[in-house]
Amino acid sequence: MSDLVSIIIPYYRKKPFFEKTIDSINSQTYKNFEIILIYDDDNRSDLLFVKKVLKKTKNKKIIVNKKNLGVGISRNRGINKSKGKFISFIDADDVWNRDKLKKQIKFMKKNSLDFSYSDYSIINEKGILIKKIKSPKIIKFKNLLFSCDIALSSVTIRSHLLRSEKFSNIKTKEDYLLWLKLSQKNIKMMGIRENLIFWRKTNNSLSSSIVQKFKDAFLVYNKYLKLNFLVSIVLIFFLSINSIIKRYL
């Protein structure tokens, strides 16, 4: 029997896109998965809608936060409830290729990987393609310091790695920080050179806030990785330039 994959989804006011996200999961050719949805909004107006959409999914858990905790802490709550040998992440407005899990799990087993990711497409709120992004085949800590080339919704990790390392509670770089911490452990990380996800760029997403990105990047380098002020500023500069090149050029 195939290994169980736990799919972690934080939800915060993504009603216009959520059904397409869940449809892309339910249509996966790899069928042995569980969805763990963390409802992270103290406003309960979308909760009935979320439950209705998830009726299509047999194996699921819905966790309702008492208050808004943020995506990092919410994902951690999902990880703690997960049972899968592998854990995959997807944001509540992104979309997967129907063969995403099948190809990724096969790729990880064939190459004895701990962590995998893929190329991805950036789409707008209407689903129109903005740009295709190629991720590097192999990522090491020293390369990751200068450029975050891993889309969260493309990531699948062996679950045992997330028992000791978790997401932080910063607003926009919580995934980047976790990838950095995991890469310091010299785990085997490799990308599939194939586009397996669609990452949705929305006008009101936290990841769209340039000021917030700068603040959180400094926290990643200076507070969490314990790098000095000057080194942190230099790395933020390179991270920003590489992000601009990747997204807009």
Spans of features found by a protein language model:
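Acidic donor-binding segment of Leloir-type glycosyltransferases
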Residues: I22-V64
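Conserved nucleotide-sugar donor-binding catalytic segment
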Residues: I138-Q212
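Short, well-formed alpha-helical segments that are part of the catalytic scaffolds
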Residues: Y11-S27
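The conserved acidic donor/metal-binding loop of glycosyltransferases
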Residues: D91-V95, D119
